[in-house]
Amino acid sequence: MPAARPRLAIIWLTVFIDLVGFGIVIPILPFYSARFGAHGMGYGALIGAFSLMQFFSTALLGRLSDRVGRRPILLATMVLNAAGYLLFAFAPSFLLLLVARLIAGFAGGNISAAQAYVADITSASERSKGMGVIGMAFGLGFIFGPGIGSIAARLGGHAAPGLVAAGLSVVNLLSAFFILPESLRAEHRAVRDLWPFGHMADALAHRELRPLMLVWLITPFAFSAYTVALPLWATTTLHWHEQELGIFFVVVGLVAAFVQGGLFRLLTRVVSDRRLLITGMMGMALSIGVVPFLAHSATLYAWTVVLAFSNSIMSPAATGLVSTFAAANEQGTVLGVAQSLGALGRFTGPFVIGVVYDWTSPLAAFLVAGGAMLVGWAASLGVPKPRRPDVSLSV
């Protein structure tokens, strides 16, 4: 791992700048959609469009990165990000705003190439620690991004956040172009078809990968459902406003940055990735299911820390295990399949939980989300202990 640290730092910076741009735009989406007369359904369409496009692109871009290398994919998606944010800034209609989110969603599929990059430069025993670096970039991006977006909108008007995000994407492109080397050696490149969904079926049929793929589908489904139900419930029950919701997301980001930025590496010295995965899944199930029984903001914030901690140990452990069970020339493909399933969960979760919340009760919504996490926890129990660094999917 010491030899990989300079390149880990570079890929960390790449993902961090990417996520800051993402974080800049997300908090202002409701207001942007309202400018064009679109409210609940329109806002949901903007969120869903991103996740739906990411569902298709993560597997495709991961597969393509196994063929042409990680660097070209990362650079190309940075160009797409800049274009998407520029369109977002100047979109004259809701339709073009939706197109901007579709572009951003496709570019967001580059996470599979970024994770494959980490897998290329780390050993199997160090892989989950390297994935934790990616997680820390996510956490810090969500901390800094919304604040930058709010300041930009206040000082420069409605187009400013998109312009700032586009500028960051250009900075990211230039820095990566000059300092990010290719990580995939020529002998590990795979020349296969680029249609990714047959490989999704292969991954689900693979004995060692199947439970991990279920975890990757269920966890984003439950977590995204939780993030939809929580603001609705907290505003009516605890009388939360924008400030309290802002604190909630900052808490999640701070805990993620702290855990995945250092604590996770310490934990992996004494606890296996499999055990961290199982523990994290149970912690998330409990912290989601308990919410409707809480009566005070302080207890909700406390359980938010539990939720964020559990997610922060579960996510890099799950990513590391997926990478460990994949062959060297299939890292992008398999990680792309996992990320595609995650995007599918993020796409379906808000819709399902919204229907449950409206048609039944807030209690039912949280119990459905928590129950889904329990199913994911049960799936995690089926993850075998890694015996060897690489297991081919034979795809």
List each language-model region with its residue ranges:
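C-terminal transmembrane helical hairpin of 12-TM major facilitator-type secondary transporters
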Residues: 274-318
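Conserved MFS/SLC helix-loop-helix module at the cytosolic interface between two early adjacent transmembrane helices
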Residues: 55-92
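Residue-level signature of mid-helix packing/kink "hotspots" within the transmembrane helices
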Residues: 23, 51-59, 109, 142-143, ...
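Helix-breaking motifs and short loop linkers at transmembrane-helix boundaries and internal kinks
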Residues: 37, 69, 90-95, 294-295
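Juxtamembrane intracellular "pre-TM" segments in multi-pass secondary transporters
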Residues: 1-5, 181-214
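Cytoplasmic helix-loop-helix junction between adjacent transmembrane helices
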Residues: 100-139
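Short amphipathic helix-loop junctions that connect adjacent transmembrane helices
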Residues: 27-41, 229-244
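Helix-to-loop junctions at the C-terminal end of transmembrane segments
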Residues: 58-69, 259-273, 357
